Amino acid sequence: MLKQKRFSAAYYGILIFAGALYALLALSRNIWADEAYTLAMLPHSFGEIWRITAADVHPPLYYFLAKLFTLPFGYSQYALRLFSGVCYFVILALGGRELSRLFGTKTGLWFMVLYPLFPFSLEHAAEARMYALSSLGVFLCALFAYRVWLENKVWDWVGFTAGGLCAAYSHYFALVAAGVIYGLLLVCCLLRRRKLLKPWLIFSAVTIALYLPWLKCFIEQLAFKANNEYWIAPITLGSLVEDLLYLLHANGTGIFPLVFGLLGLGFLFLLAREKAAAPLLALAVPVLTLALGVLISALLRPIFIIRYLVPCAPLIIFFVACGISRVQSKTLYGATAALLVTAFAGNLLFAVEDILPSPNGFNAAATAQADSAQAYLIQAGSDLHVSQIVSYYDDETPIYAGETLGAASPYPNIYPLSEFSPEEMQRVAVITDALTPPDLSLLPGFQGEKLGTYQAAFDTIDLWLLERTK
């Protein structure tokens, strides 16, 4: 009874801490292009979201659920970020309870301690994108796969299928991760428990059938990626090393990759020696997902970046939690625990710092300076990204950019540069790269001044207001 009370106190204490943390991170106002895209998508109807998303490179479930969640709040940025935090909170609450039941309270509590602080997932904890939802889908798929293996109950199969579909409809590399989980469960059934083959086949068929409505869009998106230039850079040995370092420490302290890497190898040896199948199979999911992404990128076309592995983060932390909970030596256990918690907590400072407004960040005050402009002309190198951020702060003034999203655009006021016609305009706001004057070839007879230099997510830009003089 005393142990149960201690577990309950720790469980709810961690949940309170995590809830406060996610609510705090959701206060961030530092928006980047992909988040602006999400916010522009929400006012559209569900049918329009399906159509627009089909022309993009992601499935639609995140936008549907985000629209429903934020509807009472007027599609606010805070509500959208909070939706991501809620998904992470569910992972934490369900994971802590179920992992404690299945693998012992020590494993469950370590999962709860480490997952909110894991920098790779923490960096996306309140991001207005689909990574939190896809993480939830992959985690549910894996959790119910294990429950199916133990108990073979119908509702566990339903949970397994629901998790797989949530992953598949949220992000394509979450789909890959779910496919790996389905495949690993099949292999285990063939080797050790053939009575599970029939329900596996039935619920796999159900999964495929329920994915059929999106399958045509998925195939068309794959064909587009295969036949057109895409923004993802080729993977090299150097970039792969950088990606792995980023996975280990995100944007935090440099010592973290060494600490976490060495501990990970130690846990791998320990769990392999004890033949602990569940955490080893859990680790196989991100490893195989990463390997497939790198292989396709190397052989066909670059399609993978390291943040696409975020949906597998709960499984990585489950592996770590299993490893540390099996350390027998009290001295070694204490040292390992201190290293992990210190390293993770140190990175927490960087995540919290990110919610602070960027110095000279482009925001509504910047667009207010140019409120007399009849149009924005984007002449920055990253015109596709900058135009989306500008549209978030001013969704009424026409914005013209060299690169646009075409049919995949949810923005009401972004147009291709070919449609720019300044003949009837008296004032135009021009955005250029920092320290770069406007190109006046498209604005004959215009002169003006620079209003300021701003940080628009990853780009430093100059904002100019030009007025017709002739």
Enumerate the predicted regions with their spans.
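Short, Lys/Arg-rich, polar N-terminal cytosolic tail immediately upstream
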Residues: 1-5
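Terminal, non-globular segments
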Residues: 7-468
